[in-house]
Swiss-Prot record:
GO terms for biological process: translation. The keyword Ribosomal protein applies. Part of the 50S ribosomal subunit. Contacts protein L20. One of its GO terms (cellular component) is cytoplasm. PROSITE patterns: RIBOSOMAL_L21. This is Large ribosomal subunit protein bL21. InterPro entries: bL21-like, bL21-like_sf, Ribosomal_bL21, Ribosomal_bL21_CS. GO terms for molecular function: rRNA binding; structural constituent of ribosome. Belongs to the bacterial ribosomal protein bL21 family. This protein binds to 23S rRNA in the presence of protein L20.
Length: 105
């Protein structure tokens, strides 16, 4: 069984036991997070498609880690003008482990 959930403006295909990195959530390591914006549920030969979300379906996940991605270097340059700007950015993320998928009745 798998589900497609929406969080942080992105969509993720999840199943029980899978881990995923999502945009940073306000939760501590070890906390349980409920993702209730389920777009699609697939099990055996049956598929439930939400309009836009599947009513009553949710994913229960545990926060495994709060961290940042590796640094991305941004370098701006204009030739002949001696203009150079260099800066870096590290995007924060939350790593989740899926514990349970709750289906609608």
């Amino acid at each position: 069984m798998f589900v497609v959930v929406e969080t942080g403006g992105k969509q993720y295909k999840l199943s029980v036991g899978s881990t995923v990195r999502v945009e940073k959530l306000q939760a501590n390591v070890g906390d349980e997070v409920v993702l209730d914006k389920v777009l699609l549920v697939g099990k055996d030969d049956e598929v439930l498609i939400g309009q836009p979300y599947v009513e009553g379906a949710k994913v229960i996940a545990e926060v495994v880690k709060q961290d940042k991605y590796p640094k991305v270097i941004v370098f701006k340059f204009k030739r002949k003008k001696h203009y150079r700007r260099k800066y870096g950015h590290r995007q924060p993320y939350t790593q989740l482990s899926v514990k349970e998928i709750v289906l609608p009745q």
